[in-house]
A protein has these predicted regions:
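Short, Lys/Arg-enriched N-terminal segments with co-localized hydrophobic residues
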Residues: 14-29
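Positively charged, low-complexity intrinsically disordered leader regions
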Residues: 30-75
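Glycine-rich phosphate/dinucleotide-binding loop and adjoining beta-alpha-beta core of small-molecule
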Residues: 30-34, 74-192
Length: 192
């Protein structure tokens, strides 16, 4: 079970990455990668202009992650979604819930002050609990076959501190494969 990552280099305004051509012709297709500001604007436009609720965006993100987890390259024997206080955490709670409905042993480890959770995180956590997803405190990350990094997404631009830093360090030290929602927590969206 190898976790491969793509590295992208360039100025934030001009990030692009090469992917194999989907037509199978061996060529290269270019995909534009947005900056954090551009991605936030795209989310805002989708919600405010197009009328797509934030919870629908979370559900779509969660479904995409579940699809990746079930592509045959991940061992989903026991999954832990490590959730931050924002909508990225809500994505993680939704992933755990969807996995649970598919018979996967999925649990939540929620960081931050529950009184400061985003509306989306509160809603997705409650739904996950209603589906029987258990929240754990002080997990031994080595007990899991996959960890979902849903701590922070594109919105964070400062170094990790406190319980967030400790969680990321423990996840890294565990050696367990990690699937990050949006971007690995602690990585600056524009500069890497």
């Amino acid at each position: 079970n190898q976790n491969k990552s793509r590295r992208v280099f360039g100025k934030p305004e001009t990030f692009s990455v090469h992917f194999p051509d989907k037509a199978g012709k061996g060529g290269k297709a270019m995909k534009r990668i947005l900056t954090a500001a551009q991605m936030k604007q795209a989310d805002r436009n989708t919600i405010e202009t197009m009328g797509v609720p934030s919870l629908v965006l979370m559900e779509r993100a969660a479904l995409s992650c579940v699809e990746e987890l079930q592509n045959g390259t991940w061992d989903t024997g026991k999954v832990l979604a490590v959730c931050g206080p924002g909508n990225n955490g809500g994505d993680g709670a939704a992933i755990a819930r969807i996995l649970k409905t598919k018979g996967v042993d999925a649990e939540l480890f929620c960081l931050g002050n529950p009184e400061k959770y985003s509306e989306g995180m509160r809603a997705q956590k409650k739904i996950a609990e209603n589906y029987g997803v258990r929240e754990v405190k002080n997990p031994d990350f080595r007990e899991y076959t996959v960890i979902i990094d849903a701590i922070f997404g594109i919105g964070v631009s400062r170094p990790l501190a406190g319980e967030y830093r400790r969680a990321v360090e423990a996840i890294c030290a565990s050696g367990v494969p990690v699937l990050a929602v949006d971007i690995p927590s602690g990585i600056h969206t524009d500069t890497g």
